[in-house]
Each structure stands twice: as C-alpha cells, then as structure tokens.
Curated annotation (Swiss-Prot):
This is Large ribosomal subunit protein uL2. It comes from Francisella tularensis subsp. tularensis (strain SCHU S4 / Schu 4). Belongs to the universal ribosomal protein uL2 family. One of the primary rRNA binding proteins. Required for association of the 30S and 50S subunits to form the 70S ribosome, for tRNA binding and peptide bond formation. It has been suggested to have peptidyltransferase activity; this is somewhat controversial. Makes several contacts with the 16S rRNA in the 70S ribosome. GO terms for molecular function: rRNA binding; structural constituent of ribosome; transferase activity.
C-alpha cells in the first residue's frame, strides 16, 4: 500500500516535506550474498580531480547486485520480498529460483510477495516476465530493454518509466520511449513486461537542504556569486547579471544549447524525441 504524507509545519525544515511510504517494502537488511561495499568517490576520478561536481558526503551505502541480464531461462522464481535500493529510484525484488539461487531484479509495478516470475524464449506475457522482443505482442508496455543481445538491460530502468512496442520490421523491433523518441532495437534483445515500480517517486519533496546532503549531493553555487578565476560570470562590483549569455564554468553555452555527441546508435533512432 502506498501512502503519500505531507508533514505538518512544525519547523521550517518540515514545512515542505512530502514523503511516499510503501508499507509492503522489506524493513530489514538486504540479502548479504548480493551486497558489495560501495566506496565513496565524492565525484573524483583516479587522479583525485573532481570530474562530477556537487558530490560528496552522505550516508554510507552498500551496492545491491541487480540482475539485468535475466538469463536464467525456464526456471520459475518466487518473489521473497520487495526492497528499497538507495542506488536507484526504482524498488528491487529478491527472487528465489526453483534451484535455490537468489537474485535481485528491478521490481515492476504490481509485483508482490509470493508472486512468480520467469524468463525465457517463450513464456507468458505477464508482469515481471522477461523474453526476447520478437515474442512480445505489439502494444505491450515494457521496461529493462537491452540495446545489444545478452548485454543486459540498459534502457527504461528508472522508477515509473516504460516503453511501448509499436512495430516489428525485419530484424528490428520499434519501440516508443517516454520522451517520444522512436527507436529500433534488435528482435533478439530482451525486455521485461510491465512498468517500473515506485512511480510515485516524483511526488517526493525533500523539504530542506540537509536531506540532499544525506543523499551525498552538495550545494550548487551560482556563477555570478563566484570570482572571475572560478567562472566566466564571476566578479564585478556589486551584484551583476554576469554580463554575457549563460555559460558553463568552462565557457560552453547553456540553457538549451545541445551538447549531446553523435553516437553509433544514432542510426537506430527512427524519430527524434519531442
């Protein structure tokens, strides 16, 4: 059961808090055999330089090893529990296969404890089941889509997202993404039936800066508040507008300027996003 709670304004930090509580989530620790130590990088690369700004601190986290390949075919898996995962917006499900192996999978919406899932070439079109795109009926809502066969899911993994299978053409399937983009994917690539869980994720409001810090996100300082050595908008006597069109700290135009590099997979885009 999903509960959306708005906090009472007992303090400035509580006034704007909106929390989403799922009473069906497991409240204990994660399964020990599928957890790894996650070292905090604080946005630094191997030379110690900051390559991603505004990262550092936050609560210590463990990485949950999630199965994105779903390559254990024709063996039924029973859902033991649905869990929170601090590393992604979606919830995850701990499943127990008939041969005794346990794995974490991204939980689709509607998947509950004691339900069963299965992956394979020809399995039922039911929520949580994984199969090649060639065996999925047109119009089906899908997620966790592979871009290359057997590489593992790379698209549609965030909370509440989904794509729709709209066509099949020779060796390719055509899928419509949430952005409106139409993309071709090989029919041998796998996908999971359904919508990704935790679709209420966007309704959350953290309410205060400290809640961001708990998540390892540091403050974002405006360029006009910096010195000229730190940003192209920096400096000036008194408050200024920056004196030029908005740019990044490295002088590249921002606010609508397209910076996406051409990729080899661009040729698979049938219709660009809106």
């Amino acid at each position: 059961m999903i509960e959306i709670k708005k906090a009472k304004p007992t303090s400035p930090g509580r006034r704007h808090v909106v929390s989403v509580k799922n009473t069906e989530l497991h409240t204990g620790k994660p399964f020990k055999g599928l957890v790894e130590v996650k070292k905090s990088k604080a946005g630094r690369n191997n030379t110690g330089r900051i390559t991603v700004r505004h990262q550092g601190g936050g609560h210590k986290q463990h990485y949950r090893i999630v199965d994105f390949k779903r390559n254990k075919d024709d063996i039924t898996a029973k859902v033991e529990r649905i869990e929170y995962d601090p590393n992604r917006s979606a919830n995850i499900a701990l499943v127990l296969y008939a041969d005794g192996e346990r794995r974490y999978i991204v939980a689709p919406k509607g998947l509950k404890k004691d339900m069963s899932v299965i992956s394979g070439e020809k399995v039922d079109v039911a929520v949580g089941n994984c199969m090649p795109l060639r065996n999925i009926p047109l119009g089906t809502v899908i997620h966790n889509i592979e871009m290359k066969p057997k590489k593992g899911a790379q698209m549609i993994r965030s909370a509440g997202t989904f794509a729709q299978l709209v066509g099949k053409d020779n060796a390719y399937a055509i899928i419509r993404l949430r952005s409106g983009e139409m993309r071709r994917v090989l029919l041998d690539c796998r996908a999971v039936i359904g919508v990704v869980s935790n679709s209420e994720h966007n309704l959350k409001s953290l309410g205060k800066a400290g809640a961001k810090r708990w998540r390892g996100i540091r403050p974002t300082v405006r360029g006009v508040a910096m010195n000229p050595v730190d940003h192209p908008h920096g400096g000036g006597e008194g408050r200024t507008s920056g004196g030029r069109h908005p740019v990044t700290p490295w002088g590249i135009p921002t606010k609508g300027y397209k910076t996406r590099r051409n990729k080899r997979s661009n040729k698979l885009i049938v219709q660009k996003r809106k």
